[in-house]
Amino acid sequence: MDFSTVKSLTIPEGNVIKIMSGNVVLWTKPEEPGPTPSGDLPPSNQVWYEAPAILPEYNLGSPVSHTYDESTKRGVLTYSEDIRQSVDVHYFAFRGTPITKIWWPDCCTSWDGDCMHTCPNLKEIYAGSALHSISDGTCNGGTSPEKIVLYNNENFYANETGLVKKSDNTLYLGTVNLDIRNTPCTTLGSRCMADMHLTDKTLYFPSTMNSSTGDWNIGGETPEPYTIYLPCSTAPNWTLSYIRGIITWHIPATNSGYENWKTHQSDWTFVEDL
C-alpha cells in the first residue's frame, strides 16, 4: 500500500489491530514486510498510522472485525481488548504517511526524529505520561512538527524550588516548539542545545506560571498562550524557572549568547553560574 496518499485504512481480514492511544492504530500485517514508499525496508512488519476514519469501539470479549457505517461514513473497529504495550518509536515508523497529528501511547518512553521522516503534514505530537526522552534533531525531509505537547507527564514535575526529575530525563529541543501547559512544570532545562539543529522556538507555559509583576502574562488571563522565544545562540546547561514570582533564565557565564542577551535584563533575571 502506498501510504503517501491513503487517507483512511481498510483493515484486511486476518490482520491484528491494536488501538494504542487516541486514533493511533498499530497494524501488524501477517505477511512479510515490504519496502516503504521510499524503497527502504522497515525494521518490522508493524505500520503505525493515524486513521481518522476508523472509530474504535471498546467491545471487550468480541473478536476483531472491521465494518463500515454508511450513516456516519466511518469505519468501525471492534476488538477483543484494549492492548497497550511498552514501546519505543524508532526509524521509519510513520515514514511516508499523510498524518497530521501523533499521539504516543502513555507507555511510550522515547522516540527518535526519523520515525516521522517525510511526513510533510505533521503538525503536532502529543507525548504520553511515561515519555522521558525526545530527540527531534533528525526530523528532516519537510517533516518537523510545529509543536510537541506534553500531557500528564510523570517524569517531569516541579515543586517550589524548581524542576524535579525522577531520573536523568532530558527534553532534546531542536526544530520544534514545546507546549507544557498541561504539565505542572515551573522549570525547564536543557543540557544539549548546542548539539541540535537550532532555530528560535516557542515555549507554551502552564497556568502555574503566573507573573505577580504584571510584566508577563504567562498562562494567565489572555485566551492565547503567552510565548517566550529562546535565541538560537543558547548553549547547553540553561535552566528557565519561575520561582516566587520571578522568571529566571540561568545560563553559564561562558555562554556565547550571554552578552547578547544582557540587553534583555528588563525581561529576564540572569544568574551567571548554575
Question: What would you call each of these model-derived segments?
Answer:
Residues 37-44:
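Beta-strand/beta-sandwich contexts
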Residues 44-55, 69-87, 95-110, 119-133, ...:
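Structural signature of tandem-repeat unit edges
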Residues 24-31, 173-178, 259-264:
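Short, surface-exposed terminal/edge motifs of secreted or surface/virion proteins that either
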Residues 60-65:
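N-terminal accessory interaction module
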Residues 1-37:
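Enriched but not universal
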